[in-house]
Amino acid sequence: MKKMFLFLLAFVAIVAEAQTKGNFEVLDLGSFKLHVYNTNDALGDASYIIEGKTGLVTLEQPLFKDNVSEFDAYVVSLNKPVQKIITDYHVGGTGNHDVVMIEGMPDFVKGTIYGGMMKNFAETFGNAIASMPTGKIEEIPMGSTQNWNGVKFSFQKGASTDFPAASIIIGNKVYYTHWTPVKSHVSHLQISSLAAIDAEITEAERALKSGCEYFIGGHGGAVKKDMVEFKIDYLKTMKRIIAANKTADSFIAAMKKAYPNLPGEAGLADLAKTLYK
């Protein structure tokens, strides 16, 4: 896992650039609404608002100041109180507001991997990102189910090779994990080993079995189950290709042949370097 986040530190140094503000979309799920905020920031982050009848729960608030301002203004426009602020995989610009985190994540955030990543963000992006949060942290037990604004939030262990954060089932209709499944080649930041492939397959199969209607992530927006099915098939195909190819170059060629014109081809070289060390 440490190798993957060292790659991330190098990655952010390359993608630092002027930002385009984000956009919102709203999904009406009957008993609650899911507001999806695609930040369009340099990290491809997404943030969410779960709107119940009497209040709001925010999830993975933005990190960049322009996005924080835009997100906060949108929250105010909903004219409902924010009951909980969930920080799961991504520490955001929550200021001095109290937040909810899965047990163990507050210590992990202070550690060398996550703490080093946030320090690098500060050095790379400077004043463009918000200061580290200073609010009180409420730790939620892994495996617990919370009921906020009449919506159930079930916290379960995420992919074993990722941060020690949680996948969250929201209202039995939305499944949140670190990376939204998309029809694209995976990043070397997500898959850094054969063990990571297996862990992501296990997590995706668990998501599919949840019966949820939408699948969301800290990177990417909201998708339906066909994207989860694609991810599972893609990763299993990747495992077979790795077993059949002994070099990075032959792996890249085989992946391109298996998925012609699939977005993300440019990232296959970095992925191959990671997998064929």
What are these regions (language model features)?
Residues K21-F24, D28-L29, L63-F64, V109-D233, T237:
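Metallo-beta-lactamase
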Residues K21-S77, A166-W179:
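Conserved beta-strand hairpin/beta-sheet module of binuclear metal-dependent hydrolase folds
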Residues V57-E60, K84-I86, S154-F155:
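Short catalytic-loop micro-motif centered on adjacent basic/acidic residues
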Residues T112, G116-M118, K209-Y214, G221-K277:
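Accessory terminal helices/loops
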